[in-house]
From Swiss-Prot:
Residues 4-122 form the MTTase N-terminal domain. This is Ribosomal protein uS12 methylthiotransferase RimO. Binds 2 [4Fe-4S] clusters. One cluster is coordinated with 3 cysteines and an exchangeable S-adenosyl-L-methionine. The lineage of its organism: Bacteria, Pseudomonadati, Bacteroidota, Bacteroidia, Bacteroidales. [4Fe-4S] cluster 1 binds at C13, C51, C85. It comes from Bacteroides fragilis (strain ATCC 25285 / DSM 2151 / CCUG 4856 / JCM 11019 / LMG 10263 / NCTC 9343 / Onslow / VPI 2553 / EN-2). GO terms for biological process: tRNA modification. HAMAP family: MTTase_RimO. Catalyzes the methylthiolation of an aspartic acid residue of ribosomal protein uS12. GO terms for molecular function: 4 iron, 4 sulfur cluster binding; aspartic acid methylthiotransferase activity; metal ion binding; protein methylthiotransferase activity. Residues 132-363 form the Radical SAM core domain. Its EC number is 2.8.4.4. It catalyses: L-aspartate(89)-[ribosomal protein uS12]-hydrogen + (sulfur carrier)-SH + AH2 + 2 S-adenosyl-L-methionine = 3-methylsulfanyl-L-aspartate(89)-[ribosomal protein uS12]-hydrogen + (sulfur carrier)-H + 5'-deoxyadenosine + L-methionine + A + S-adenosyl-L-homocysteine + 2 H(+).
Length: 432
């Protein structure tokens, strides 16, 4: 009997990607062939793992569902299922509006999906995944949900309260992934620094990272999505002392004006934010900081925005992203503030802020010319090997381009590279 093929389409963040990888492993065990992120149906069944964070993400998810619903109507697909954050948040409404979908599931209801396919969920496979990333790196999700109640954010509504995974379970997953060739781990959570508070009654991120770093075969550990309030200072020591913990921190600061931080319900002040950045750079020499900022939140004055621009100029972040405020139903901001800043002004502020960062990024990249750096090779594109340094996370950060001239480099291996040139985003290097 011919094995059926299931297409898994993943939208949104890396946390969603981990969910898809776990589901793919279960489906393979159930006897299906599985593909990932096909633009058109390649099999009999499709599962779309949606994002519902902000307006643009919701629109992308709905458009993808409609495209596959049309394919089903045209006879190119037998079954269509939808899961993930958008489905969790609007399950009943979506089921009414898009009847071509056979069933919508909440974010965590994989067992229900497998059951409806007539298959069993294998508990013994709970730490196993079918990686969609290059085999040398993986995302490592250490918790679900978030207990922070930032004014603008719908994540706690969608995913619920913070739930930490047990340390031993995470370590077992790391060992499993290392045994399958993974060398580099992007440690992710909605809020890293809260890890352990629910389970162990104290912040346990420093201990967790230290224990991961002790596992043979773990070459790089990179941390994503920290929160500035109540930052666990013991982590500075771990990052400084452990060579395989990258000198890199992704910490979403959102704003610097005390007025905006209070309206955003961030529980941190301008003074505390500057102090934390100073601590990072003092305690972990050479650290590269990535942050995310928001413009256009209700109540943001020209003065607030000027403070934000001055903050970016003064701190000179190594990596920075920014986005405009999007009103999300059910949030504190939607209930208590009027979304009164015109979209045109939000976009103008975003463009102005990113232009400042663009100049900073160009200067910081140029300052690396002449340096020798450890680089991991991710792929080949045309006449270049494409790699990254410890200061660069996949998908979101700059890359290192090495011309394919006589050097037979292996994907997933580390090499010493001398930087010979740079542009606004990327570095150019040659093997030493």
């Amino acid at each position: 009997m011919k094995r059926k093929t299931i297409d898994i389409i993943t939208l949104g963040c890396s946390k969603n990607l981990v969910d898809s990888e776990q589901l793919m492993r279960q489906l393979e065990e159930a006897g299906y062939d599985v593909t990932h992120d096909s633009e058109k149906p390649t099999g009999e069944i499709a599962v779309i793992n949606t994002c519902g964070f902000i307006g643009d993400a919701k629109e992308e998810s709905i458009n993808m569902i409609l495209e596959f619903a049309q394919e089903k109507e045209e006879g190119n697909l037998e079954k269509l299922f939808v899961m993930g954050c958008l489905s969790e948040r609007y399950l009943k409404e979506l089921a009414i509006e898009i009847p071509q979908v056979d069933k919508f599931y909440g974010k965590f209801n994989w067992k229900g999906l497998l059951q409806d396919l007539g298959k069993a969920y294998h508990e013994e496979l709970h730490i196993e995944r079918t990686l969609t990333t290059p085999k040398h790196y993986a995302y490592l999700k250490i918790s679900e949900g978030c207990d922070r109640k930032c004014s603008y954010c719908a994540i706690p509504i969608i995913t619920g309260r913070h739930v930490s995974r047990p340390i031993e379970e995470i370590l077992d997953e790391v060992r499993y992934l290392v045994s399958n060739g993974v060398k580099e781990f992007q440690v992710i959570a909605q809020e890293l620094t809260y890890y352990g508070v629910d389970l162990y009654k104290k912040q346990m991120l420093p201990e967790l990272i230290e224990r991961i770093s002790e596992i043979p075969g773990v070459e790089w550990i990179r941390l994503h999505y920290a929160y500035p309030a109540h930052f666990p200072e013991e982590l500075f020591r771990v990052m400084r002392e452990r060579d395989n913990v990258c000198k890199y921190m992704d910490i979403a600061l959102q704003h610097i004006s005390d007025n905006m931080l209070q309206r955003m319900r961030r529980h941190v002040t301008k003074k505390e934010t500057y102090r934390l950045i100073e601590q990072f750079r003092k305690e972990v020499p050479g650290i590269h900081l990535r942050t995310t900022l928001m413009v256009g939140h209700p109540g943001e004055t020209e003065g607030d925005f000027e403070e934000l621009k001055e903050f970016v100029r003064k701190v000179r972040f190594d990596r920075m992203g920014a986005f405009t405020y999007s009103e999300e139903e059910g949030t504190y901001a939607a209930a208590n503030y009027e979304d009164s800043i015109p979209q045109e002004l939000k976009q103008a502020r975003l463009d102005e802020l990113m232009a400042i960062q663009q100049g900073i990024s160009t200067e910081l990249s140029a300052s690396k010319v002449g340096q020798k750096m450890k680089v991991i090779i991710d792929r080949i594109e045309g006449e270049y090997y494409i790699g990254r340094t410890e200061f660069d996370s996949p998908e979101v950060d700059p890359e290192v381009l090495i011309r394919c001239e006589g050097d037979n480099l292996m994907i997933g291996n580390f090499y010493q590279v001398q930087v010979i040139d740079s542009d606004e985003f990327d570095l150019f290097g040659e093997i030493i």
